[in-house]
Curated annotation (Swiss-Prot):
It comes from Desulforapulum autotrophicum (strain ATCC 43914 / DSM 3382 / VKM B-1955 / HRM2). Keywords: Cytoplasm, Fatty acid biosynthesis, Fatty acid metabolism, Lipid biosynthesis, Lipid metabolism, Phosphopantetheine, Phosphoprotein. 4'-phosphopantetheine is transferred from CoA to a specific serine of apo-ACP by AcpS. This modification is essential for activity because fatty acids are bound in thioester linkage to the sulfhydryl of the prosthetic group. The modification O-(pantetheine 4'-phosphoryl)serine is found at residue 37. PROSITE patterns: CARRIER, PHOSPHOPANTETHEINE. Carrier of the growing fatty acid chain in fatty acid biosynthesis. Pathway: Lipid metabolism; fatty acid biosynthesis. The lineage of its organism: Bacteria, Pseudomonadati, Thermodesulfobacteriota, Desulfobacteria, Desulfobacterales. This is Acyl carrier protein. PANTHER family: ACYL CARRIER PROTEIN (PTHR20863), CARRIER DOMAIN-CONTAINING PROTEIN (PTHR20863:SF76). Residues 1-77 form the Carrier domain. The keyword tRNA-binding does not apply. It holds the Pfam family PP-binding. GO terms for biological process: lipid A biosynthetic process.
Length: 77
């Protein structure tokens, strides 16, 4: 599974009411997909576990869109 597909799957699984078809690269995690602060923490933790990486808090705050998360993970893995 590609990084993009895996990130999209994690987001769709963790955010209730979000279909994987809605998880497009340009989508804002908060504004478009409805993630609140707790959901964002859960997303980061799930991505860290799935990709066996550590995501710094400063870097996590910069993940505004789905694509931000995908690109960050591509660089780290």
């Amino acid at each position: 599974m590609s990084v993009e597909a895996k990130v999209k799957k994690i987001i769709a699984e963790k955010l209730q009411g979000v279909d994987i078809e809605d998880v497009i690269p340009e989508a804002s995690l908060v504004d478009d997909l409805g993630a609140d602060s707790l959901a964002l923490v859960e997303l980061i933790m799930s991505m860290e576990e799935a990709f066996d990486i550590d995501i710094d808090d400063d870097d996590a705050e910069k993940m505004i869109t789905v694509n931000d998360a995908i690109e960050y993970i591509r660089k780290k893995s």
